[in-house]
């Protein structure tokens, strides 16, 4: 428990600020709102549940955003709450803005707590029966910790148009190495490294291919995800403000799960659903049932009035 890792998402592309602070403001539109929810291991034990909300906005000089997540795991209700602010800057590398680099920073508060009274210890067994009134003999210095968290990231983008682009980035989190131990001994949280590549290729007027990958490493633990989705545009769609599309994808988390995803885009809205099919050594207990996840996104556009060079005067003037 004391060596716990950071949370993760199967729909990693649909939580962009959590993935890399350089993603702040990197979208078509003016303001972006995102909500995510994940429920996993319900078939094994008390479900692990995570939800997050974020908002980010473009600005003239710097983009900025806010992210908050809440995670609760296990019988002891090990809870993590994090609230952070992000800022990023995009720099054009070519006159036509095809090539660009962005850099970002995330800063905020991380709070962790556990209900130590929910655990049972061997010292509470008197040789005949379990007695919860007996002392645990566990020297908890505290049952909660609040620390400062800091992260940075950078990303390169090649944008041909809205349906053809490549993005690759790297980010580092937990740079303050906060003490997360509940005992007297200091347990430092490991730095988390994220590397991601996202690609979109227009196949024809109706179909897009969207492969991507993400590699994360934190201490001795790492995670590799690879997969792709396809997007089909429904009649009445265009590349600007009216987008109606369906998405379906398959993803693989190495040595852990296969992930099936479905999504729908309608104008300014996106809803994505995914389900993890567990393939790890936990299969006998999980019966291949992993986690359900949902992502909801809304993008707000600031419409500008069209310039009219000529007006037709009424006959009575």
Feature-to-residue mapping (PLM):
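Subset of outer-membrane beta-barrel
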Residues: 5-317
